[in-house]
Amino acid sequence: MAQNGQGIEPAVLDDIINRLLEFRNARTVRQVQLSEAEIRSLCTASKEIFLHQPNLLELEAPIKICGDIHGQYGDLLRLFEYGGFPPEANYLFLGDYVDRGKQSLETICLLLAYKIKYPENFFLLRGNHECASINRIYGFYDECKRRFNVRLWKTNTDCFNCLPVAALIDDKILCMHGGLSPDLTDLDEIRNLPRPTDIPDSGLLCDLLWSDPSREVKGWGMNDRGVSYTFGSDKVAEFLMQHDMDLVCRAHQVVEDGYEFFAERQLVTIFSAPNYCGEFDNAGAMMSVDENLMCSFQILKPTDRKPRFL
């Protein structure tokens, strides 16, 4: 592909990936010190690819789908150990790469590097934390400032503003970070969302990244997050029927087993950060979709061993 590695020499890109993977079998999760120029070049090259590809990605199975990572870099490496390091498998990540965990920079750098190296096999969606007003507060800004400078945080923000927001797998599985929206009646509405863009406080883009399913509501309800809506199983069934789809696949909420079904298996939540924040005893999961659109789950068990950061 012409856009493959645009702006980064393939040998330089491979060197960055090799350094990021250097500690993949170590018992301790170490910091990987890339230069500011290297991180900047990852942001610039990947941004070009994101804008070259549609806002609603149209993908084919087989593919592995991962939920929130939140800077838990050691767990991201464990996911790849389980699922196969790219290009062994195709991947779709559902957003929330940064904040809360200690290694947001390593996490986003490896994901962007794989996006540049394998643009047609490796896909990243935007989560609600890929937004300046959120990651300014929950850790990513502080990590950028501590390890580099505020300018690098702004470079990442420019990149995040170009991420696609949804993916459709074989016309049957719709994937996004948050959930459905009362403003979503036609998939062209997703395709036509402008980029680059910040995330607004309401409307379709906001809902795709912020809404949550709820067993307590029918239709649309208030969301405790103070942003967007909750939606009942009736809205999931209605949406799938109208669009001749089988499944909504989303992330955005910690679930004990790493995955959780809703609405008679018409929606699944995937969360891929085990022992989230060191405060939860949740597992992490990755969903494998095979050629026949059969879904199975690979589980990262919560580990008793707290990683030591060097």
From Swiss-Prot:
Cofactor: Mn(2+)
Cofactor binding summary note: Binds 2 manganese ions per subunit.
PROSITE patterns: SER_THR_PHOSPHATASE
GO terms under cellular component: cytoplasm; nucleus
Active site location: 129
Binding site for Mn(2+) 1: 68, 70, 96
Molecular-function annotations in GO: metal ion binding; protein serine/threonine phosphatase activity
Keyword Manganese: yes
EC number, as in UniProt: 3.1.3.16
Keywords recorded for this protein, A-Z: Hydrolase, Manganese, Metal-binding, Protein phosphatase
Residues holding Mn(2+) 2: 96, 128, 177, 252
TM helices/strands, residue ranges: none
InterPro entries (alphabetical): Calcineurin-like_PHP_ApaH, Metallo-depent_PP-like, PP1_catalytic_subunit, Ser/Thr-sp_prot-phosphatase, STPPase_N
Enzyme class: hydrolase
Taxonomic superkingdom: Eukaryota
Catalytic activity: O-phospho-L-seryl-[protein] + H2O = L-seryl-[protein] + phosphate; O-phospho-L-threonyl-[protein] + H2O = L-threonyl-[protein] + phosphate
UniProt xrefs under PANTHER family: SERINE/THREONINE PROTEIN PHOSPHATASE, SERINE_THREONINE-PROTEIN PHOSPHATASE PP1 ISOZYME 2
Similarity section: Belongs to the PPP phosphatase family. PP-1 subfamily.
Protein name: Serine/threonine-protein phosphatase PP1 isozyme 2
Highest classification ranks of the organism: Eukaryota, Viridiplantae, Streptophyta, Embryophyta, Tracheophyta
